[in-house]
């Protein structure tokens, strides 16, 4: 089964995320487990955790189909030792929050070298950060998201993802989330079924489909290779509908969260219906 959903709000409490997902007909969802633009957040309360788990069960959401995202402030490749330590501590806390909620995945952006160190050194720092977090926690899989190639962010090339994975000590707890807008922005074509097939074949050769734990389904506002992270609604951007038809019809993407992050949250229910109509 294809598990299409969206990145839903936790306004009023994390326990509202599965309710918001159910309301739009989602079969998966993503969420922040805290304010993503602050370093410090209060611990999760037992009542919220219990309600979250109860609502997930009622909505039929298995932990494999829920893709929490870490804070945007975290940079696991930060060249500044003090800031790197702060990011590592926050990342471990994010992993712990996911575990508290009974979740098994944590989606994150790899990191940025900030023009202060080279790519290889930064990739090494990112991998070291992940290894530390895996050792400090019990079961959550760290899910690296590919990036659009903006600025000094790493992760836009499949080779970056492979280089990180190669340095991970426990590869049973590392995975990848592919964002379609980011793929397109970094030069991986999805505009036709044939182009999409070539892109995912390249991903399989370079990284391995066994590492794919989720996807973000977003059309792209800017042309192929723009290196700009600008999302568009499904079928209304430069990717177009055929790449998404390929994803919805391919057996490669069964039983992983396929998460909308498109600009119009009011239209997510209709976009989910549109995607299922492509099967």
From Swiss-Prot:
Record note on cofactor? Binds 3 Zn(2+) ions.
Q: Is DNA repair included in the keywords of this UniProt record?
A: yes
Which GO terms fall under molecular function for this chain's record? deoxyribonuclease IV (phage-T4-induced) activity; DNA binding; DNA-(apurinic or apyrimidinic site) endonuclease activity; phosphoric diester hydrolase activity; zinc ion binding
- Keywords for this protein: DNA damage, DNA repair, Endonuclease, Hydrolase, Metal-binding, Nuclease, Zinc
EC nos: 3.1.21.2
InterPro entries associated with the record: AP_endonuc_2, AP_endonuc_F2_Zn_BS, Xyl_isomerase-like_sf, Xyl_isomerase-like_TIM-brl
Q: Please indicate if the UniProt record lists Hydrolase as a keyword.
A: yes
Q: Which PROSITE patterns does the entry link to?
A: AP_NUCLEASE_F2_1, AP_NUCLEASE_F2_2, AP_NUCLEASE_F2_3, AP_NUCLEASE_F2_4
Q: Which GO terms describe its biological process?
A: base-excision repair
| Residues the entry annotates as binding Zn(2+) 3 | 182, 229, 231
What catalytic activity does the UniProt entry give for this protein?
Endonucleolytic cleavage to 5'-phosphooligonucleotide end-products
Q: What class of enzyme is it?
A: hydrolase
Residues that, per the record, bind Zn(2+) 1: 69, 109, 145
NCBIfam families referenced in this protein's UniProt entry, alphabetically? nfo, PRK01060.1-4
Return the similarity comment.
Belongs to the AP endonuclease 2 family.
> Which HAMAP family does the UniProt record give?
Nfo (MF_00152)
Q: What is the documented function of this protein?
A: Endonuclease IV plays a role in DNA repair. It cleaves phosphodiester bonds at apurinic or apyrimidinic (AP) sites, generating a 3'-hydroxyl group and a 5'-terminal sugar phosphate.
What is the designated name of this protein? Probable endonuclease 4
Q: Which organism is it from?
A: Chlorobium phaeovibrioides (strain DSM 265 / 1930)
> What gene does the UniProt entry assign to this protein?
nfo
């Amino acid at each position: 089964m294809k598990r299409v959903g969206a990145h839903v709000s936790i306004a009023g409490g994390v326990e509202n995320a599965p309710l918001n997902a159910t309301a739009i007909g989602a079969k998966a969802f993503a969420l922040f487990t805290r304010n993503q633009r602050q370093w410090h957040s209060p611990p999760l309360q037992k009542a919220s955790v219990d309600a979250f788990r109860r609502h997930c069960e009622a909505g039929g959401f298995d932990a494999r189909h829920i893709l929490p995202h870490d804070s945007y402030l975290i940079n696991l490749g930060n060249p500044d030792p003090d800031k790197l330590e702060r990011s590592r501590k926050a990342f471990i806390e994010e992993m712990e929050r996911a575990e508290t909620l009974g979740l098994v995945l944590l989606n994150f952006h790899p990191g940025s070298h900030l023009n202060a160190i080279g790519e290889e050194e930064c990739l090494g720092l990112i991998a070291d950060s992940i290894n530390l977090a895996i050792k400090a926690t019990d079961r959550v899989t760290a899910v690296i998201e590919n990036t659009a190639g903006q600025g000094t962010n790493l992760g836009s090339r499949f080779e970056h993802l492979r280089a990180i994975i190669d340095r991970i000590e426990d590869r049973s707890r590392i995975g990848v989330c592919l964002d379609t807008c980011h793929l397109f922005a970094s030069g991986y074509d999805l505009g036709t079924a044939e182009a999409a097939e070539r892109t995912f074949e390249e991903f399989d050769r370079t990284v391995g489909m066994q590492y794919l734990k989720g996807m973000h389904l977003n059309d792209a506002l800017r042309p192929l290779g723009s290196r700009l992270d600008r999302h568009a609604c499904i079928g209304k951007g430069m990717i177009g509908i055929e790449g998404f038809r390929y994803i919805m019809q391919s057996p490669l993407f069964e039983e992983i969260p396929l998460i909308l992050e498109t600009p119009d949250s009011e239209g997510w229910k209709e976009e989910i219906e549109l995607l299922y109509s492509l099967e």
